[in-house]
Amino acid sequence: MPRFDASGLITAIVTDARDGELLMVAHMNEEALRLTLETGIAHYWSRSRKTLWKKGETSGNLQSVVELRTDCDQDALWLKVHVAGDGPTCHTGRRSCFYRQVVSSGGKVALTMASDHDQ
């Protein structure tokens, strides 16, 4: 069984089951994992709001879990999902939460829009 940290959470890495794109990184507590396994729909624990959250419940972009794996230490999960609706995963309306690239130039670090993500 997965190993939760001292806060009762486990990191969840989420990718698109079709093309493997990294969509988001979230956290699950025991209840979120149980609900995910029971329903086949991804549930997470919001650390900022301190509440359970069914991803896509408001937007209609539910995440149906196709496959769930754990790493060798059993302290991280990998969810391969199909996203319902028009497909965004990020609260900004983008497909992936990883749409910004960290670049370093001339000793300065900046965030830029990644060229492989929609605006």
UniProtKB/Swiss-Prot annotation:
Q: According to its record, what are the GO cellular component terms?
A: cytoplasm
Write down a Pfam family by its short name: PRA-CH
General function of this protein: Catalyzes the hydrolysis of the adenine ring of phosphoribosyl-AMP.
Origin organism of this chain? Brucella abortus (strain 2308)
Name the SUPFAM superfamilies on file.
Answer: HisI-like
Q: In which pathway does it act?
A: Amino-acid biosynthesis; L-histidine biosynthesis; L-histidine from 5-phospho-alpha-D-ribose 1-diphosphate: step 3/9
Q: Where does Zn(2+) bind?
A: 72, 90, 97
Family from the record: Belongs to the PRA-CH family.
Query: Which cofactors is this protein said to need?
Result: Mg(2+); Zn(2+)
Give the residues the record marks as binding Mg(2+). 71, 73, 75
Describe cofactor binding as the record notes it.
Answer: Binds 1 Mg(2+) ion per subunit. Binds 1 zinc ion per subunit.
Q: What is its EC number?
A: 3.5.4.19
Q: Where in the cell is it found?
A: Cytoplasm
Stored InterPro entries: PRA-CH, PRib_AMP_CycHydrolase_dom, PRib_AMP_CycHydrolase_sf
Q: Which reaction does it catalyse?
A: 1-(5-phospho-beta-D-ribosyl)-5'-AMP + H2O = 1-(5-phospho-beta-D-ribosyl)-5-[(5-phospho-beta-D-ribosylamino)methylideneamino]imidazole-4-carboxamide
Record flagged with keyword Mitochondrion: no
Quaternary structure, from the entry:
Homodimer.
Q: Which keywords accompany this UniProt record?
A: Amino-acid biosynthesis, Cytoplasm, Histidine biosynthesis, Hydrolase, Magnesium, Metal-binding, Zinc
Cite the GO molecular-function annotations of the record: magnesium ion binding; phosphoribosyl-AMP cyclohydrolase activity; zinc ion binding
Gene3D superfamilies found in the cross-reference section: 4.10.80.70, Phosphoribosyl-AMP cyclohydrolase
User: Quick one: a GO biological-process term for this protein?
Assistant: L-histidine biosynthetic process
Q: What is this protein called?
A: Phosphoribosyl-AMP cyclohydrolase
The principal location of this protein is cytoplasm
